[in-house]
A protein has these predicted regions:
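Acetyl-CoA-dependent GNAT
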Residues: 39-96, 107-108, 113, 168
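Conserved catalytic-core motifs of GNAT/GCN5-like acyltransferases
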Residues: 73, 81, 124-126, 139, ...
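Conserved acetyl-CoA-binding loop-helix of GNAT-fold acetyltransferases
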Residues: 99-114, 135-140
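A short beta-loop-alpha structural element at the N-terminal edge
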Residues: 9-21
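Conserved beta-strand-loop-alpha-helix junction that forms the acyl-donor binding cleft
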Residues: 98, 124-135
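Conserved GNAT acetyl-CoA-binding A-motif
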Residues: 114-127
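A structural signal for short, well-ordered beta-strand segments
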Residues: 89, 123-125, 165
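Conserved GNAT-fold acetyl-CoA-binding loop/helix
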Residues: 22-49
Length: 169
């Protein structure tokens, strides 16, 4: 468990956290391009990720005063075996808690765990554009922007580009 301030805690997610995590994610689905989901997924979606982790798959929450304010996770980049050393990472923070450094804290904890695994070589993150805050978060966590895929998503009546970020040892 990592404590960043007196009442801010980062820890492994549990089943009890899933409703709050789903609320954070589903708000992003409904109101932003941070995810290309177009319909809310609910707690069952995140529960599947939590219940069936592969080696190097982590799901962390950040809490303040016992309230889940965000989460980060790592998962497979692609299903083929040769990609096993590459993890895709994501972070989501509740709208009311953004700008407080919680995403940075979550990534620091998540990336430290991944760095400790000899079989995990690199991490990849995908950022829908424009998103200055997310791009700054990834650059600050040691990621490098390696490319942009143009107009690969369609949400809210428009096409959206995705920037690809990679973090190497």
């Amino acid at each position: 468990m990592t404590e960043a301030a007196t009442s801010t805690v980062i820890r492994d997610a549990t089943q009890a956290d899933l409703p709050a995590m789903a609320e954070i994610y589903d708000e992003q689905v409904r109101s932003s391009i941070a995810t290309f989901e177009t319909e809310p997924r609910g707690a069952a979606y995140l529960g599947e990720k939590l219940a069936h982790p592969a080696p190097g798959d982590f799901m962390l929450v950040v809490m303040r005063d016992r309230v889940v304010l965000g989460y980060a996770y790592s998962g497979p980049f692609r299903p083929r075996p040769a990609y096993a050393g590459t993890k895709e990472v994501s972070v989501y923070v509740a709208a009311a808690a953004r700008g407080q450094g919680l995403g940075r804290m979550l990534y620091a904890a998540l990336l430290a765990r991944l760095d400790a695994l000899p079989d995990v070589h690199t991490q990849v993150a995908v950022v829908a554009l424009p998103n200055d805050a997310s791009e700054a978060l990834h650059l600050g966590a040691g990621f490098v922007r390696v490319g942009v895929l143009r107009e690969v998503g369609h949400k809210f009546g428009r096409y959206i580009d995705s920037a690809w970020y990679q973090r190497l040892p």
